[in-house]
Curated annotation (Swiss-Prot):
SMART domains: IG (SM00409), IGv (SM00406). Disulfide bonds join C42-C120, C167-C246, C302-C376, C432-C511, C566-C645, C701-C782, C838-C918, C974-C1080. Keywords: Disulfide bond, Glycoprotein, Immunoglobulin domain, Membrane, Repeat, Signal, Transmembrane, Transmembrane helix. It comes from Mus musculus (Mouse). SUPFAM superfamilies: Immunoglobulin. CDD domains: IgV. Residues 20-138, 143-262, 276-386, 401-539, 545-661, 676-803, 813-945, 949-1097 form the Ig-like C2-type domain. The keyword tRNA processing does not apply. GO terms for cellular component: membrane. This is Immunoglobulin superfamily member 3. It is found in: Membrane.
Length: 1194
């Protein structure tokens, strides 16, 4: 707690220090129109003292920006200066409080002199000064130039007819403003109804009554031209009846972003009567005025509006304060009640039917008791068959009240003036007319008084009842110079004249008339007095005094003329002198100097530095205004710069002295001396050009129009490639016809191929690229610059334009290379020669060179291999296949005629087999001399098969068997019946053929061998292995080299070649073991083209049966040598034995079925019976083997 109060005190001090007064005012500048009602808000915050703050408004006029002129205050009624006192007191300027710290300044009738810088000040209520106490903003007052006009008319329409009304809306406001236009309909005293409107944001809108019809297109608002707005209602309805007028508002955007309607105007109305197509009718009551004096007449008109009124029946009744006055039936005969019938009889009242739809009530002499409400009622009647009338619908309008005032026996005074607002220096004329009722002998005394803006009253001049004039004390001097005059024009009319008025003459002029009547005793006495006044506003000459410099041509072309206008506002009469001085600031300088001055007495004075302007400048002052025009001819750069005019306003005093009232400086007017507007047009047409290389590319650049016949042109030629971002310069020709090659021409070596030409017509330029290449393809275009000669005789570039593009495609000649596609096959024997032909049927150019390549696809090899190729210069080259297959010495190429190429392969071998074809490349020379491959084609394929000779080797197969005795020799001949080639060689080998296991039986005879072969056939069915054993006796190779002798016969063999086709092998000292089959095997060998021997085929002779007889005979040999004995002993017992076994098994099977019927059903396997397998040999005496396999017998 001890620390709390010090801290609280510190916070309080800090709060006081931190709070400071802040005054804010509406952000300016604000643009408002004359005669409008404006408001400017002002807020104050951060203050101390009472919550309700006071506000004081002041203005700083443009004529004296440093001098404060006080306007109005919420605290001090004497705060306003004299210039504003009258308007403040009259309520035309006042301050409206919004809150205690916020207020609005109201100016109800804004004047041009109200423009300036406004300051809102709040008197201090703080303990000390801290913060801001005032804020300023600018107000600009502009003329109200909005005009809304329409043709006033009355239209009679029938329901469903279309309606079109037009309204002209125009404004001359310099500032950026928006217009809103609305069409409204008004019926009598009802509030207007919006038909359709165009907002300032260009949005169409209608009220709820017309919204649906607008959405359906029944109601439209169209803008025609710049200022005409047309309303269209396509199908009128009875509810559309009324007065149509358009209302326009001009909006401007304030600095805070909000829009403000500166002024609103409405046009004259068009009354539209819509006649319904049904039985409806309307009634309205009209009278001229509602306030009357006793004795005056009044007329009431009851107007009926309906269709076909003559064919219908209506009755009318009149009422006064709900009491019946009179009735009138369809026969138009009035019937009045007793009170009004008496007045009607005296001619003071009349009830009549003026026309079919108009009924009148007239009272010729009103009484005071006639004050009240009047009305009429119209009832439609229907006539029956009997002629009687039945009332139908009845309608009555609103009551019209009138007031009848009693007569006053007094004088009345009327004051009139020649103008309510005059310009300072103009004459003021006032008339005071006295109207009397009776008292023809009365006299009047008149006093003219002036009540100024500060409500101070002063006597100007008075006339007593005896006709004596006397000026007021303040007007003695002016009256002596004739500046103030008063006159009695008629007995009841008095005038006051003030000549060469001044600003201080402004105020309320009052005519005070006193009526004097002579009494019985002859004395004059006042019986009454009346006052009347009129307000006169005198606009100071300097009010709204402004100077504006304008030019219709702020930008002029070389050598042209231009006018400068110095507009003086307002429009002063000729009596008000204004001197005008034109000043000039050349381009690039900071000081102005006087060109010429038009003095107030009409003289002309030239400035010290205007010598260059005198010969080319004309100055003229308008007779009807003080506007001064400066005309300068033959414009050049020296006349470019900023111009300004200075005006001085003078006033002539009543004593013939002069006073300079104000000086105004206009806006800066910058005149730019411009180059001429270009008319350059370059042809934009696009072209597509396709040509074959070595031709010429013709590019045209056409100037369709030019600014001047003296124009020169610089032409730049560009090419754009797809790979480049921008075009590249090829060639430039300047306006002086000089040539410059671009980087592209240098890089691509185009200098020697470019040719530029300007045609005689002058507007066509051509660029030719000779000997076009494929690399010259691209998008070509020209860039044209137009050059003119300035007034200072210097060339300048006026404009430039790019032409349309020419898409150039340079292509190589179309390929016409074509080879023969004939497919072929070729079969040859080894060592022969083959010929492969490649025929060129067509080619692109006779100047082309051909490269011919032969290749081959080998079997089981997917890739092709080059055999050889013939280059473009006719040089023969071997391919990789030639090295592989040793073709280098066997290939030969020739071309017997143009387009025919042959490849010869000599001494062919089997490995040369394959599918052969040729490929031809056609090469052409480019325009630069470089050869390039233009096309290639592949010919039809030729299948080549290289075969070895057919095998024709035959060995004698008919060889007799032989039987020799033991120790004797036997011969094995090998006879070759035919051979495949005379160059062949033979390899011969003799074999001993024995069955496996045959060694146990020893050697067999010929017959035994045959039986053994049958046995071998049976055994082959049971065993897939070869049962024969081959043993080489002797072999002789194709190179005549002997192989080793077989061991059983080693040393017992003798070889002989009896002839080239007969070979003999002799086996000496035969033994029984030599018994058996023998054969000879012959191989035929041939030499390949590479001189290598290969085996062509082989052949084997038939077996030769050799039987070597043993000197001792056995039982076995006896049985085996006798077939009948052999079958009896070894074959017949076996079938008998088999049948016996089968019979036993069948008997046993049946006995088991009878004892065990369900055994098979219980899963016990049935008896499987296999025949016994017997192994026996029909060629030997070994006993047969009986085999019974497992499971054969249970």
């Amino acid at each position: 707690m001890k620390c709390f109060f010090p801290v609280l005190s510190c916070l309080a001090v800090l709060g006081v220090v931190s709070a400071q007064r802040q005054v804010t005012v509406q952000e300016g500048p604000l643009y408002r129109t004359e005669s409008s009602h404006i408001t400017i808000w002002c807020n104050v915050s951060g203050y101390q003292g009472p919550s309700e703050q006071n506000f004081q408004w002041s203005i700083y006029l443009p004529s004296a920006p440093e001098r404060e002129v006080q306007i109005v205050s919420t605290v001090d009624s004497s705060f306003p200066y004299a210039i504003y006192t009258q308007r403040v007191r009259g309520g035309k300027i006042y301050v409206e409080r919004i809150q205690g710290n916020s207020a609005l300044l109201h100016i109800t009738d804004l004047q041009a002199r109200d423009a300036g810088e406004y300051e809102c000040h709040t008197p201090n209520t703080d303990e000390r000064y801290f913060g801001s106490y005032s804020a300023k903003m600018n107000l600009v007052v502009i003329p109200d130039s909005l005009q809304t006009t329409a043709v006033p008319q009355t239209l009679h329409k029938v329901e469903q007819d279309p309606l079109e009304l037009s309204c002209e809306v125009a404004t001359e406001t310099v500032q950026h403003t928006h217009l809103s236009v609305s069409w409204l309909r008004q019926k009598g005293g009802e509030n207007p109804v919006e038909v359709i409107s165009l907002s300032r944001d260009f949005i169409l809108h209608s009220s709820s009554e017309y919204a649906q019809r607008q959405s359906l297109g029944e109601v439209r608002l169209d803008k025609l031209g710049r200022s005409t707005f047309r309303l269209t209602i396509f199908h009128l309805q009875p509810s559309d009846q009324g007065e149509f007028y358009c209302e326009a508002a001009e909006w401007i955007q304030d600095p805070d972003g909000s829009w403000y309607a500166m002024t609103r105007k409405r046009s004259e109305g068009a009354v539209v009567n819509v006649q319904p197509t049904d039985k409806e009718f309307t009634v309205r009551l009209e009278t001229d005025k509602r306030l009357h004096t006793v004795g005056e007449p009044v007329e009431f008109r009851c107007i009926l509006e309906a269709q076909n009124i003559p064919d219908r029946y209506f009755a009318v009744s009149w009422a006064f304060n709900s009491s019946l006055i009179a009735t009138m039936g369809p026969n138009a005969v009035p019937v009045l009640n007793s009170d009004f019938a008496h007045r009607e009889a005296k001619g003071q009242l009349k009830v009549a039917k003026e026309s079919d739809g108009v009924f009148v009530l007239k009272i010729y002499h009103l009484r005071q008791e006639d004050s009240g409400k009047y009305n009429c009622r119209v009832t439609e009647r229907e006539k029956t068959v009997t002629g009687e009338f039945i009332d139908k619908e009845s309608k009555r309008p609103k009551n019209i009240p009138i007031v009848v005032l009693p007569l006053k026996s007094s004088i009345s005074v009327e004051v009139a003036s020649n103008a309510s607002v005059v310009l300072e220096g103009e004459d003021l004329h006032f008339s005071c007319t006295v109207r009397t009722v009776g008292r023809l002998q009365a006299r009047f005394s008149v006093i003219w008084q002036l009540v100024d803006r500060q409500n101070r009253r002063s006597n100007v001049m008075w006339l007593d009842r005896d006709g004596t004039l006397q000026p007021g004390s303040a007007y003695w001097e002016r009256s002596s110079y004739g500046g103030i005059q008063m006159e009695q024009v008629q007995p009841n009319s008095f005038s006051l004249g003030i000549f060469n008025s001044r600003k201080e003459d402004e105020g309320q002029y009052e005519c005070h008339v006193t009526e004097w009547v002579r009494a019985v005793d002859g004395e004059w006495q006042i019986v009454g007095e009346r006052r009347a006044s009129t307000l006169v506003s005198i606009t100071a000459l300097e009010t709204g005094f402004a100077v504006t410099a304008i030019s219709r041509t702020p930008g002029v072309t070389y050598s042209d003329s231009f006018d400068l206008q110095c507009i003086i506002k307002p429009h002063y009469p000729a009596r008000v002198p204004v001197s005008v001085t034109w000043r000039f600031q050349p381009v690039g300088t900071v000081e102005f100097h006087d060109l010429v001055t038009f003095t107030r007495d009409g003289g002309v004075q030239w400035g010290d530095k205007s010598s260059t302007f005198r010969t080319r400048t004309a100055i003229e002052k308008a007779e009807s205004s003080n506007n001064v025009r400066l005309s300068i001819s033959r414009a050049s750069d020296t006349e470019a710069g900023k111009y300004q005019c200075v005006a001085e306003l003078w006033r002539r005093n009543y004593n013939n002295t002069w006073t300079r009232l104000a000086e105004r400086t206009s806006n800066l007017l910058e005149i730019r001396v411009l180059q001429p507007v270009t008319k350059l047009q370059v042809s934009k047409s696009k072209r597509t050009l396709t040509l074959v290389e070595n031709r010429a590319i013709q590019l045209n650049c056409s100037v369709k129009s030019q600014t001047s016949p003296n124009s020169h042109f610089a032409v730049l030629w560009y090419v754009h490639k797809p790979s480049d971002a921008d075009g590249k310069l090829i060639l430039k020709t300047t306006h002086s016809s000089a040539f410059e090659y671009g980087t592209y021409a240098e890089e691509e070596g185009l200098r020697g191929r470019l040719q530029f030409e300007r045609h005689v017509s002058g507007g066509l330029f051509s660029l030719t690229v000779q000997r076009a290449e494929v690399s010259d393809s691209g998008s070509y275009y020209c860039h044209v610059e137009e050059w003119l000669l300035s007034p200072n005789y210097a060339w300048y570039k006026l404009a430039e334009e790019v032409s349309g593009r020419t898409e150039v495609t340079v292509k190589q000649p179309d390929s016409r290379l074509k080879l023969s596609q004939v497919q072929g096959s070729l079969s040859v024997l080894e060592t022969r020669q083959i010929q492969l032909e490649c025929v060129v049927l067509n080619r692109t150019s006779v100047a082309s060179q051909l490269l011919v390549e032969w290749f081959v696809w080998k079997p089981n090899h997917p890739e092709r291999e080059v055999v050889a190729h013939l280059s473009r210069d006719a040089t023969f080259h071997y391919g990789e296949q030639a090295a592989k297959n040793n073709l280098k010495g066997r290939l030969h190429a020739e071309s017997p005629s143009s387009g025919v190429y042959r490849l010869f392969i000599q001494n062919v071998a089997v490995q040369d087999s394959g599918t052969y074809s040729c490929r031809v490349e056609e090469w052409l020379p480019s325009p630069s001399g470089v050869w390039y491959k233009r096309a290639e084609d592949t010919a039809g394929q030729t299948a080549v098969t290289v075969m070895r000779p057919d095998a024709a080797l035959q060995v004698d197969t008919v060889v007799p068997n032989a039987t020799v005795t033991e120790k004797a020799a036997f011969q094995l001949d090998c006879s070759i019946l035919s051979r495949s080639s005379q160059d062949s060689r033979f390899a011969v080998a003799w074999y001993s053929l024995r069955t496996k296991g045959g060694g146990k039986r020893g050697s067999l005879g010929i017959d035994e061998q045959e039986e053994e072969e049958e046995e071998e056939d049976i055994s082959q069915e049971e065993d897939s292995e070869d049962p024969t054993e081959r043993t080489v006796l002797l072999s002789v190779g194709p190179d005549a080299v002997f192989g080793p002798e077989g061991s059983p016969w080693e040393g017992r063999l003798r070889f002989q070649r009896l002839s080239p086709l007969l070979y003999r092998l002799t086996v000496l000292e035969a033994s029984p073991q030599d018994t058996g089959n023998y054969s000879c095997h012959v191989e035929e060998w041939l030499p390949s083209p590479q001189k290598e021997w290969y085996r062509l085929t082989e052949e084997e002779s038939a077996p030769i049966g050799i039987r070597v007889l043993d000197t001792s005979s056995t039982l076995q040999s006896l049985i085996c040598s006798n077939d009948a004995l052999f079958y009896f002993v070894f074959f017949y017992p076996f079938p008998i034995f088999g049948i016996l076994i089968i019979t036993i098994l069948l008997v046993r099977f049946k006995s088991r079925n009878s004892s065990k019927n369900s055994e098979g059903k219980n899963g016990v396997p049935l008896l499987w019976i296999k025949e016994p397998h017997l192994n026996y040999s029909p060629t030997c005496l070994e006993p047969p083997v009986l085999s019974i396999h497992p499971g054969a017998i249970d």
